[in-house]
């Protein structure tokens, strides 16, 4: 019989709606969660104790030190405030979206590459995984379900590092969603804003079918 996996050390960067919801889900799943923003850690602790009981509020360098997973939950226009040195080598969830109609035209994202590829180029040494961008924060809180639940929702993920995707897949599963691997980071184009996946809710089989339609290639059944 295999021994239980140890809890993940999860650093959540950002204390907005998305960051606090994911921190709560991670705490509920039994993980060691550290929350950090650019504000003073003592000031953040006052907010964190109320919004996310069980989380540790700290500085960004301390939050990311030794973390198994980092969640970049900052607004897109602030992605360049992410500490590249602190994130180097880490599995990093990018859940940011580029909405030209909402954010206005941002020239660096007006390119053939996906927003995640642009962000991954900036982060350089980080192992970026695109996920959780096609589900709203309120749905994260309301739609998570235990494994095997027939109403469990699927979440797509894409990245170039298989080990990072394995960590992210475990995290998604343990907070209540079925992870479906879309492929490399560029495959995240299949669930950017304006796509059927971005605008819909799917179980794992349906998600694989949608990804196959988008990519015109088979998605592994164990994804």
Question: What residue ranges belong to the model's regions?
Answer:
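NAD(P)+-binding Rossmann beta1-loop-alpha1 motif at the extreme N-terminus of oxidoreductases
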Residues: 1-49
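Rossmann-fold NAD(P)-dependent oxidoreductase module
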Residues: 21, 25, 122, 171
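Rossmann-like NAD(P)-binding element
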Residues: 52-103
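General beta-strand structural signal in soluble alpha/beta enzymes
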Residues: 57, 127-131, 180-182
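Short, conserved loop/helix-junction motifs that constitute active-site signature segments
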Residues: 84-89, 122-124, 147-149
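Rossmann-fold NAD(P)-binding glycine/threonine-rich loop
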Residues: 96-146
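Active-site-lining helix/loop region of Rossmann-like oxidoreductase modules
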Residues: 150-223
């Amino acid at each position: 019989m295999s021994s239980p996996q140890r809890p993940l050390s999860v650093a959540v960067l950002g204390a907005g709606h998305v960051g606090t919801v994911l921190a709560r889900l991670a705490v509920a799943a039994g993980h060691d969660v550290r929350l950090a923003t650019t504000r003073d850690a003592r000031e953040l602790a006052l907010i964190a104790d109320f919004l996310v009981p069980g989380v540790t509020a700290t500085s960004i360098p301390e939050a990311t030190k030794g973390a198994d997973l980092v969640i970049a939950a900052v607004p897109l226009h602030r992605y360049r405030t992410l500490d590249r040195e602190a994130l180097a080598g880490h599995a990093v969830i990018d859940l940011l979206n580029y909405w030209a109609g909402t954010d206005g035209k941002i020239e660096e994202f007006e390119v053939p590459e996906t927003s995640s590829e642009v962000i991954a180029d900036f982060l350089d040494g980080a192992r970026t995984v695109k996920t959780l961008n096609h589900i709203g924060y309120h749905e994260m809180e309301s739609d998570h379900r235990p494994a095997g639940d027939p109403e469990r929702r699927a979440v797509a993920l894409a990245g170039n590092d298989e080990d990072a995707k394995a960590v992210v897949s475990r995290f998604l599963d343990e907070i209540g969603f079925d992870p479906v691997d879309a492929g490399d980071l560029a495959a995240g184009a299949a669930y950017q804003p304006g796509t059927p996946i971005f605008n819909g809710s799917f179980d794992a089989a349906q998600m694989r079918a949608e990804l196959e339609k988008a990519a015109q290639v088979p998605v592994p059944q164990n994804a």
